[in-house]
Swiss-Prot record:
The keyword Kinase is assigned to this record: yes
PANTHER family reported in the protein's UniProt record: PHOSPHOGLYCERATE KINASE, PHOSPHOGLYCERATE KINASE 1, CHLOROPLASTIC-RELATED
Pathway, per record: Carbohydrate degradation; glycolysis; pyruvate from D-glyceraldehyde 3-phosphate: step 2/5
Main location: cytoplasm
EC identifiers of the protein: 2.7.2.3
Gene name, Swiss-Prot/TrEMBL: pgk
The entry's keywords: ATP-binding, Cytoplasm, Glycolysis, Kinase, Nucleotide-binding, Transferase
Pfam families the UniProt entry points to: PGK
Protein name: Phosphoglycerate kinase
Residues given in the record as ATP binding sites: K207, G294, E325, G354, G355, D356, S357
Length: 398
């Protein structure tokens, strides 16, 4: 999969449409106005933006934010993101309240080389998610060169991630996309062994293809989170009131059998009547009483998983081990984050992806001790299972 990169493109004097992933959490500032709550994804796009500006291109940034349902929503405007970006790059960042159209084209054509503009939320137009040809064409009309740097949205065939590239002569990978693909290709296609994968989260159904793929590639696949209870139930364990995908029991059984011993499941659990901060939490081994639900992996499982991770040469993690945003049920996820960092310190190549996992890394102070922190959740899973990413497939072959 060799695609054009920024190194292959002369952007001087060119209008460069950069699809970034500025789908960031918003907060409220002291004066009541919206502001950026976490700028990790914005910072991740800076190398590409800086390259275009430093090489005399006009940077035209497009992104989605949230789920406005194909119509304008003032609460999901990117205006405050433009302000935040300006402080990061120490440049004026223009903002357009429109995404496409004659007015936007006129503003862009009047921009000087080395300047930047952020256009309004692409999802304010229903044509974005529908990958509408008219909307994709309107985006293409704004630029001479297209660059996709939004790995977090690369698994979606939307107008700004895939459709627009069909109407551009030059469509290239951004720096972030290059880094993501390089790191994840190493994990998927040429991992050093032993390889350990850790998957958590709530649903088996969200990760079917990834579980299948990793159970073939990895030496050990450690399962946590609510989806572990679906597996435990099909193996005959009592899981109490734990969340189970009843319509996926047969699928989970097939996956477990096909994995031929690769999958490891929790042996003890932190349980309570509800996932609440003031709930009475306790640890049970084996079966879970009927009135209780499993909400985190227990200490014995933490020790076992940590040992596996520390023995790995390659380790990849996606998904929390429990309801980590509630303190009594955060220990398992925090322990995995710390074990990942320790394994990296010992020489392992580590990859962490998915919003919850990355958030846990940050909370534990381990985010700078990981080989590669991915900006993708769904895109990471799609890539690891070997499925094509529309946002990459649409780009110009090198």
């Amino acid at each position: 999969m060799h695609k054009l990169t920024l190194d292959d493109v002369d952007v001087r004097g060119q209008r460069v449409l950069i699809r970034v992933d500025f789908n960031v959490p918003l907060d409220t500032s002291e004066d009541g106005s919206p502001c950026v709550g976490d700028d990790t994804r914005i910072r991740a796009a800076l190398p590409t933006i800086r390259h275009v500006l430093d090489h005399g291109g006009k940077a035209i940034l497009v992104s989605h934010l949230g789920r406005p349902g194909g119509q304008p929503d003032p609460d999901l405007s990117l205006a405050c993101v433009a302000d935040h970006l300006g402080t990061l790059i120490e440049e004026r960042v223009r903002f357009s309240s429109n995404t496409v159209g004659d007015t936007v084209e006129e503003v862009i054509n009047g921009m000087s080389e080395g300047s930047v503009i952020l256009l309004e939320n692409t999802r304010f137009d229903a044509g974005e998610k529908a990958n509408d040809e008219a909307f994709a064409t309107a985006l293409a009309n704004l630029a001479d060169v297209y660059v996709n740097d939004a790995f977090g949205a690369a698994h979606r065939a939307h107008a700004s991630t895939a459709g627009v590239a069909e109407f551009m002569d030059v469509a290239a990978l951004g720096r972030l996309m290059e880094d993501e693909i390089e790191a994840l290709t190493r994990v998927r296609d040429d991992p050093a062994h032993p390889m350990v994968a850790i998957l958590g989260g709530s649903k088996v159904s969200d990760k079917l293809g990834t579980i299948r793929a990793l159970s073939e590639t990895a030496d050990h696949l450690l399962i946590g989170g609510a989806m572990s209870y679906t597996f435990l139930k099909v193996l005959g364990h009592e899981v109490g009131a734990s969340r189970v995908e009843a319509d996926r029991l047969d699928t989970a059984e097939d996956l477990y059998e096909q994995a031929e011993g690769t999958i490891t499941l929790p042996t003890d659990h932190v349980v309570a009547e509800a996932p609440e901060a003031d709930a009475t939490a306790s640890v049970v081994e084996g079966d879970i009483p009927a009135e209780l639900m499993g909400l985190d992996i227990g200490p014995a499982t933490i020790d076992a998983y940590r040992d596996r991770i520390l023995g790995a040469a390659t380790v990849v993690w996606n998904g929390p081990m429990g309801v980590f945003e509630v303190d009594p049920f955060a220990d398992g996820t925090t322990a995995i984050a710390e074990a990942m960092a320790d394994a990296t310190d010992d020489g392992a190549f580590s990859v962490v992806g998915g919003g919850d996992s990355v958030s846990a890394l940050t909370r534990s102070g381990c985010d700078d001790r990981i080989s590669h922190v991915s900006t993708g959740g769904g895109a990471l899973l799609t890539f690891l299972e070997g499925a094509p990413l529309p946002g990459v497939e649409a780009l110009t072959d090198a």
